[in-house]
Regions:
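Conserved C-terminal "switch" segment of AAA+ ATPases
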Residues: 91, 153-163, 167-223
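Walker A/P-loop
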Residues: 23-58, 88-89, 119
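Pre-Walker A (pre-P-loop) alpha-helix and adjacent loop at the N terminus of AAA/AAA+ ATPase modules
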Residues: 1-31, 83
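The Walker A (P-loop) glycine that initiates the GxxxxGKT/S ATP-binding motif of P-loop NTPases
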Residues: 32, 70, 101
């Protein structure tokens, strides 16, 4: 629901890809406050529109680069990295790979290493020659993957990485929009999860509005 400006930017971007496939790179950045539907926009929007498999990587809790590029197979208990794992799970070479909380990488101990790998992934002149440390002698062609990143604070994103991306902005919701989202999307989802019927879980509009407008509860959040 909502995000019409962001949806328009996505349609323009896809239109450019159709008319001139080489005009844009293979990386997109979505900037916006928490809770504004960035993940849903990618998973339920871009991924389904393009008919591609969707994969999610949370960067906020990533400790070091080995999570992405794996460990050498000579080490006991070593494994391949998350990127190659996604290719195995999706069984294709062109999935949509969504990296959440890019701005949190700068807070991790080895943030620069992670940024280096992400920069390589989004470099169209290099990402057809990706190497995982576990499969050191095998080259993976990631040039057909679509890499999408989300972040809240642009000042914490590497300028080099940021400049490689087609940037899409999402805005927060007004109170009336939050009410519609709560009634038409959130409550039905909650009822389904707990196996309640429509008449077994009823929250009146005035109660929802009070929750939305109560700063002590929502902390003036722009999302839901």
């Amino acid at each position: 629901y909502g995000l019409n400006d962001a949806k328009m930017q996505i349609m323009q971007m896809i239109g450019q890809w159709i008319t001139n496939p080489g005009a844009l790179g293979t990386a997109i950045a979505i900037k916006g406050p928490p809770g504004t539907g960035k993940t849903s926009l990618v998973k339920e929007g871009i991924s389904k529109i393009l008919g591609r498999e969707f994969s999610f990587i949370a960067l906020g809790g990533t400790g070091d680069a080995s999570f992405l590029e794996g460990h050498s197979y000579t080490y006991e208990g070593s494994m391949w990295g998350r990127i190659v794992q996604i290719l195995m799970e999706s069984k294709c070479m062109n999935p949509v790979i969504y990296f959440d909380e890019l701005d949190k990488v700068s807070d991790t101990p080895r943030g620069e290493e992670i940024i280096g790998i992400l920069t390589h992934l989004t470099d169209t002149s290099q990402n057809s020659q990706y190497h995982d440390k576990y499969f050191s002698e095998i080259t993976f062609d990631l040039s057909k993957c679509l890499f999408i990143f989300s972040y809240n604070d642009e000042s914490k994103v590497s300028p080099i990485l940021r400049d490689r991306m087609y940037r899409i902005m999402t805005k927060g919701y007004e109170a009336k929009e939050k009410l519609i989202i709560a009634k038409d999307f959130l409550l039905p989802k909650i009822r389904e999860q707990v196996a309640f019927k429509d008449d077994e879980l009823i929250i009146p509009d005035d109660i929802l509005t009070e929750i939305i407008k109560n700063d002590a509860i929502t902390m003036e959040e722009e999302g839901v």
